[in-house]
Amino acid sequence: TSGETLNTSQWTVIPALTKSIVIDRAQNDLLLNINGMYQANNGAANNTGGITSTIGFFVNDQLIDVKPLYLDFQSSCSYRQFMIYGIAKNLSPGTHTVKFAIRNISAPNISGLTVTYGGPNSSCSSLSGFESAMSSTITINQPYSF
């Protein structure tokens, strides 16, 4: 729910993408982008169902936007690329901390199932670290008043 406080028992923060930003003007727009891949170690016999998760965009540990993700198990070591945007408007002037976090919602009951975000799953060989890395972009628009 928008406005909820970051609860690290429910959300996994991606530390490498945490950034401090400075807002100078009361009128502003913030565009957040995160992209990368995630991969499960499902086997060929588990090609039904998938994993439902969400990406949360947090400013000062308050949820400002959330977007769903779904990884469909269509083949062994299923993976999916994603590019997701979040927005915020009119943050107060000052320094703010932006965090991106992942929350797993549901997954099939498969013994030993693991999901890796931003890297290849250690049980799979179909992705490289380079192609599965996560990155983020933070764009701040602060129009001048003349």
Named regions from a protein language model:
Residues 1-146:
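Extracellular jelly-roll beta-sandwich "head" domains, especially the C-terminal globular C1q domain
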